[in-house]
Amino acid sequence: FKDIPADRMGPRVRYKESIDAILSEPFDTKLVKPCVESKVFGIGVEAYTVGSAEFSLSYAAMNKDKCLPLMDNGHYHPTEVVSDKIPALLTFFPEIALHVTRPIRWDSDHVVLFDDETKEIAKEIVRCENGIDRTYIALDYFDASINRISAWVTGFRSFQKALLDALCQPSEMLKELQDTNQMSKKMVVMEQCKTLPIGDVWEEYCRQCGVEAEGWFDEIQKYEDEVLSK
């Protein structure tokens, strides 16, 4: 609702009944992964969102055999971070799903970058027990003001870099330092990790995949000039 509702529970009961009806249809849970996703607010629904965080998470918890909790890091209050929520959910759910995006003040779906929260999300996926195998990752962004192929490549590669960066860090060592209360050394090692040469590792990864590390934009520019602009 755009403004203050008179009945907050009724729409949620109807929403629950609707999802129940959808999930009552037979499907192969190995091939189809239904998800429930929350949102704090949106344009036109500033006062009340039926699928709140509490509603969606509660529904997923009560229906683990039929659906997964899905978190979009643009769907929460600006002071909340999805990276902190990942280990919380993986403690209770066998699998979770993510929409990785880049919010600016609200769920603006800007192109994913290799920024702090993107890196933190990747770290938690890697550091949680079997997190990579238990997390379904989708990228959720669009910016019509820039070349959409460039946007697609930039966002996709940014999260690949974030995962690669997380995989290169000494996670087991850091966990041991924390568990043995060596907090000063943990801080020092975590700071050292920030200046590790991830660029060199990324270039080698791209070389092994048979693609260019950073020289791809010229091809996109040529395609824009010769095809998209016609």
Predicted regions and their residues:
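Glycine-enriched alpha-helix->loop->beta-strand junction motifs that scaffold or abut catalytic
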Residues: 64-66, 90-96
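Alpha/beta catalytic barrel-like cores
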Residues: 10, 25, 30-32, 43-49, ...
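Histidine/acidic residue-rich metal-binding segments in metalloenzymes
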Residues: 52-62, 88, 120, 125-127
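Active-site acidic/histidine proton-transfer and metal-coordination neighborhood
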Residues: 1-64, 68, 173
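Acidic catalytic motifs of isoprenoid enzymes
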Residues: 82-83
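Short, glycine/acidic-enriched loop or turn micro-motifs at the edges of active sites
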Residues: 74-75
